[in-house]
Amino acid sequence: FMIETMHGPLALAHNGNLINSAELRNELMEQGVGFSSSSDTEVMTMMLARNGGGTWEERIKTAMAKWIGAYSLVILTRDCVYAVRDPWGFRPLCIGLLPNGGHAVASETGALQTLGCEAIRDVKPGEVVSLSNSALKVMQALPTVNPTSMCIFEHIYFARPDQVWDGINVHHVRQRLGEELAREITEKMGSDFGDVVIPVPDSSVPAAIGFSHVTEIPYNDGFIKNRYVGRTFIEPTDSLRKRGVALKFNVINENVRDKRVVVIDDSIVRGNTTCLLYTSDAADERSSV
């Protein structure tokens, strides 16, 4: 959201969700504030616009004390850029030094590397980092909640595999998860339960590689992904979801024909993707998450 305020222009970009957004919205409406959307990002923007204080740092700190939930923010004012992260550390946020001496802020380190950034650091939970005229200033606006609550789905699904979060590479985490899954399954089922391991692309590929390494079951591609189809699990009806899956994935029959197929996926909500194998030439299908 971008608005004009009594303190000057203000723009805010937000990754996350406030769980007390409705309560904060009602408080603002009782004060005469109007809204053009149902977004919690607009609520946060309006709170900053109405807050007193002599500096944007003070206004941000005051607002953070009222925000409950996940938020990684980039706030742009006339003279400064602020990187803000909630005290639980739900979502990632990082800062890099540009080759020309300026700074860039992004959710993922991969975006900063593309810009040629060096000296990349995470914005720590509860921090407000101000960037102005190549200078970087850090303020601990709220104490870090102990323990932190990093969203597990970042490592499993959301993040790009080249992302480094809290010093840990996402691809490495996913591969290790696949290895651990393989150990747990072989303890219960032995080692002779599959002929081929295939991932549901793309986020499950590292886990399938790790699973294959431990079980020594050959890894292969079983699905071809249409990269022009978006996420299907958020469609409003099951018929639309199934149609989306049919458009998004095609089975490579030659790689699964007459084989016991072990499918590795990051999560199973309704099983629509793995159901495609039942109409293929696979002899048997087993799903592991």
Regions found by a protein language model. Give the residues of each.
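ATP-dependent adenylate-handling active sites, centered on carboxylate activation for C-N bond formation
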Residues: 185-187, 256-260, 276
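Conserved small/polar residues in nucleotide/adenosyl-binding loops
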Residues: 278-285
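A glycine-rich phosphate-binding loop feature that marks nucleotide/adenosyl-phosphate handling sites
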Residues: 195-206, 227-229
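Short, glycine/charge-rich flexible loops or terminal/linker lids adjacent to PRPP-binding catalytic cores
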Residues: 214-262, 272
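Conserved short alpha-helical segments that host acidic/polar catalytic motifs at enzyme active sites
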Residues: 1-125, 130-195, 200
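Structured, non-catalytic alpha/beta "coupling" segments that mediate domain-domain communication
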Residues: 125-127, 208-214
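Extended, hydrophobic alpha-helical segments in both membrane/secreted and soluble proteins
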Residues: 197, 205-211, 219, 260-277
